């Protein structure tokens, strides 16, 4: 089967959706499928190469307490038509299909089976509220809908009601199979591990505030922070100015 994985974010820049797409690509190829990743260009990632097809240019912008991407091109329709005619996909798998403008245009012009995975979760979203009114046609072209969690399903169903199958993000267990526990943190103290981008949507500052409350109440739990991002300096300052112990 020939499959196109459509990501609204510039591939392979770091991020949860792109990581999801990467592992899907690798595992689908292991199962004998012919797979392409369809993305935009940005910075050093300018031209199509190998199994990566680039259309338009991606621009980063803040959205929903995180960083999103909007893709623009003066020749979107002709580029997408040429790509679809050339590749002749059996199935297109869209990730966040309503993020402008690459995914909606591909979805509108697709003659393949169209599947979508929804990753996002948030409160009220003006952009999704607007999208629910102008992208009904694109939503109707989806043959299957996946949400990575119950929370993601609840969020997207609010704006695009329909039948969603919850399939959680996979974990590459081989990567951790030979991992050896670090003796440094095997001292009987309870460890709380945070792995993710330091940004409002991930809640790293909320976690630090909760940890501070627990320490005041006598907890000796240790908070381990792994990651980086726009709130890293603020997080370090919070720890230092409040002399917050038990954080590494």
Go through each PLM region and give its residues.
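Active-site proximal beta-strand in glycosyltransferases
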Residues: 3, 91-93, 98, 103-124, ...
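N-terminal strand-loop element at the rim of the active site
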Residues: 7-13, 21, 25-74, 82, ...
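An amphipathic, basic-hydrophobic alpha-helix
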Residues: 62-91, 101, 130-137
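Carbohydrate-associated surface elements
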Residues: 41, 151, 170
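Acidic anion/phosphate-binding donor-loop and adjacent secondary structure
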Residues: 47, 126, 154, 158, ...
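Membrane-proximal helix-turn-helix segments that form the acceptor-binding/catalytic region
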Residues: 128-147, 151-159
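Nucleotide-activated donor-binding/catalytic signature segment of Leloir-type glycosyltransferases, i.e.
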Residues: 233-248
């Amino acid at each position: 089967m020939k499959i196109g994985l459509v990501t609204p974010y510039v591939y392979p820049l770091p991020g949860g959706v792109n990581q999801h797409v990467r592992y899907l690509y690798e595992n689908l190829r292991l199962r004998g499928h012919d797979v392409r990743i369809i993305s935009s260009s940005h910075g050093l990632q300018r031209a199509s190469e190998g199994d990566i097809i680039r259309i338009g240019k991606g621009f980063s912008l803040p959205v929903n307490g995180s960083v999103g991407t909007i893709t623009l091109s003066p020749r979107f329709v002709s580029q997408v038509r040429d790509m679809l005619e050339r590749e002749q996909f059996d199935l297109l798998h869209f990730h966040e299909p309503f993020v402008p403008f690459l995914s909606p245009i591909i979805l509108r012009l697709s003659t393949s089976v169209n599947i979508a995975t929804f990753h996002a979760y948030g409160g009220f979203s003006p952009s999704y509220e607007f999208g629910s009114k102008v992208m009904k046609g694109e939503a109707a072209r989806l043959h299957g809908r996946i949400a990575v969690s119950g929370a993601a399903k609840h969020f997207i169903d609010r704006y695009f009601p329909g039948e969603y199958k919850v399939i959680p993000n996979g974990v590459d267990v081989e990567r951790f199979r030979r991992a050896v526990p670090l003796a440094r943190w095997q001292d009987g103290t309870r460890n709380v591990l945070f792995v993710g981008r330091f940004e409002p949507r991930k809640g790293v500052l909320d976690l630090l505030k909760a940890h501070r409350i627990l320490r005041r109440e006598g907890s000796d739990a240790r908070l381990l922070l792994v990651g980086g991002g726009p709130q890293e300096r603020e997080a370090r300052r919070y720890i230092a100015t409040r002399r917050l112990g038990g954080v590494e």
